[in-house]
Protein backbone atom coordinates (compact mmCIF):
# COMPACT_ATOMS: atom_id res chain seq x y z
CA UNK A 1 0.00 0.00 0.00
CA UNK A 2 1.43 3.40 -0.92
CA UNK A 3 1.94 5.94 1.82
CA UNK A 4 0.49 9.46 1.88
CA UNK A 5 3.66 11.12 0.57
CA UNK A 6 3.84 8.84 -2.47
CA UNK A 7 0.15 9.36 -3.18
CA UNK A 8 0.44 13.16 -2.97
CA UNK A 9 3.62 13.19 -5.06
CA UNK A 10 1.67 11.31 -7.74
CA UNK A 11 -0.96 14.07 -7.61
CA UNK A 12 1.77 16.71 -8.21
CA UNK A 13 1.74 18.06 -4.64
CA UNK A 14 4.94 19.76 -3.52
CA UNK A 15 6.43 19.03 -0.10
CA UNK A 16 7.18 22.08 2.03
CA UNK A 17 9.07 21.47 5.27
CA UNK A 18 8.13 23.17 8.52
CA UNK A 19 9.48 23.26 12.06
CA UNK A 20 7.34 23.13 15.19
CA UNK A 21 8.41 25.96 17.52
CA UNK A 22 8.42 25.86 21.33
CA UNK A 23 5.17 27.81 21.14
CA UNK A 24 3.64 25.02 18.99
CA UNK A 25 3.46 27.38 15.99
CA UNK A 26 4.58 26.00 12.63
CA UNK A 27 7.55 27.86 11.12
CA UNK A 28 8.16 27.77 7.37
CA UNK A 29 10.82 29.43 5.29
CA UNK A 30 9.84 31.12 2.07
CA UNK A 31 10.46 33.99 -0.29
CA UNK A 32 8.41 37.03 -1.13
CA UNK A 33 9.52 38.82 -4.29
CA UNK A 34 12.71 36.73 -4.22
CA UNK A 35 13.63 37.77 -0.65
CA UNK A 36 13.95 35.09 2.06
CA UNK A 37 11.85 35.23 5.19
CA UNK A 38 10.57 33.21 8.13
CA UNK A 39 6.84 32.81 8.54
CA UNK A 40 4.33 31.25 10.89
CA UNK A 41 1.94 28.94 9.11
CA UNK A 42 -1.31 30.29 10.53
CA UNK A 43 -4.31 28.16 9.67
CA UNK A 44 -6.49 30.56 11.66
CA UNK A 45 -5.30 33.64 9.77
CA UNK A 46 -7.63 34.33 6.85
CA UNK A 47 -5.04 36.36 4.94
CA UNK A 48 -1.26 36.23 4.75
CA UNK A 49 0.47 39.22 6.28
CA UNK A 50 3.78 40.87 7.11
CA UNK A 51 4.76 43.71 9.42
CA UNK A 52 5.18 47.35 8.38
CA UNK A 53 8.93 46.95 8.92
CA UNK A 54 8.99 44.38 6.08
CA UNK A 55 7.73 46.70 3.33
CA UNK A 56 11.22 47.60 2.08
CA UNK A 57 12.72 44.20 2.93
CA UNK A 58 10.28 42.36 0.66
CA UNK A 59 10.10 45.14 -1.97
CA UNK A 60 6.38 45.68 -1.44
CA UNK A 61 4.24 48.38 -3.00
CA UNK A 62 1.92 48.80 -0.02
CA UNK A 63 -1.10 51.06 -0.31
CA UNK A 64 -3.46 52.46 2.31
CA UNK A 65 -6.38 50.21 3.18
CA UNK A 66 -9.58 51.02 5.06
CA UNK A 67 -9.76 47.42 6.25
CA UNK A 68 -9.00 46.88 9.92
CA UNK A 69 -7.31 43.67 11.04
CA UNK A 70 -8.19 41.58 14.07
CA UNK A 71 -6.68 38.50 15.63
CA UNK A 72 -4.30 37.15 18.24
CA UNK A 73 -5.90 39.28 20.94
CA UNK A 74 -5.96 42.56 19.02
CA UNK A 75 -8.71 44.34 17.06
CA UNK A 76 -9.05 47.46 14.92
CA UNK A 77 -5.46 47.26 13.66
CA UNK A 78 -4.55 49.67 10.82
CA UNK A 79 -3.54 47.89 7.62
CA UNK A 80 -2.05 48.42 4.20
CA UNK A 81 -2.43 46.18 1.17
CA UNK A 82 0.39 45.04 -1.12
CA UNK A 83 -0.92 43.49 -4.34
CA UNK A 84 0.63 41.30 -7.04
CA UNK A 85 3.65 39.91 -5.24
CA UNK A 86 5.41 36.62 -5.85
CA UNK A 87 5.53 34.05 -3.08
CA UNK A 88 7.61 30.89 -3.07
CA UNK A 89 7.33 28.17 -0.45
CA UNK A 90 9.62 25.28 -1.33
CA UNK A 91 8.99 24.63 -5.03
CA UNK A 92 5.42 26.02 -4.90
CA UNK A 93 5.00 29.52 -6.38
CA UNK A 94 2.24 32.05 -6.91
CA UNK A 95 2.83 35.25 -8.85
CA UNK A 96 -0.36 37.18 -7.99
CA UNK A 97 -0.10 37.08 -4.24
CA UNK A 98 -1.65 39.83 -2.08
CA UNK A 99 -0.41 40.63 1.42
CA UNK A 100 -1.91 42.48 4.33
CA UNK A 101 0.66 44.74 6.00
CA UNK A 102 0.09 45.60 9.66
CA UNK A 103 1.81 46.05 13.02
CA UNK A 104 3.01 42.58 13.97
CA UNK A 105 4.77 43.69 17.14
CA UNK A 106 2.25 41.89 19.39
CA UNK A 107 2.92 38.63 17.50
CA UNK A 108 6.70 38.93 17.75
CA UNK A 109 6.60 40.10 21.38
CA UNK A 110 4.71 36.91 22.25
CA UNK A 111 7.29 34.80 20.40
CA UNK A 112 10.29 36.49 22.05
CA UNK A 113 8.60 36.13 25.45
CA UNK A 114 8.95 32.37 24.90
CA UNK A 115 12.56 32.76 23.70
CA UNK A 116 11.58 32.16 20.07
CA UNK A 117 12.94 34.30 17.23
CA UNK A 118 10.60 36.89 15.67
CA UNK A 119 9.06 36.12 12.27
CA UNK A 120 8.62 38.22 9.15
CA UNK A 121 4.98 37.34 8.67
CA UNK A 122 2.16 34.84 8.72
CA UNK A 123 1.16 32.57 5.86
CA UNK A 124 -2.61 32.36 6.09
CA UNK A 125 -5.56 30.39 4.77
CA UNK A 126 -5.49 32.33 1.49
CA UNK A 127 -2.26 30.56 0.51
CA UNK A 128 -3.31 27.24 2.02
CA UNK A 129 -6.53 27.25 0.00
CA UNK A 130 -4.82 28.40 -3.21
CA UNK A 131 -2.20 25.66 -2.87
CA UNK A 132 -4.74 23.04 -1.72
CA UNK A 133 -2.49 22.45 1.29
CA UNK A 134 -2.43 19.30 3.36
CA UNK A 135 -0.57 19.57 6.66
CA UNK A 136 1.09 16.33 7.76
CA UNK A 137 2.64 16.52 11.23
CA UNK A 138 4.34 13.13 10.98
Predicted feature residues:
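Pepsin/retropepsin-fold aspartyl endopeptidases
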Residues: 1-138
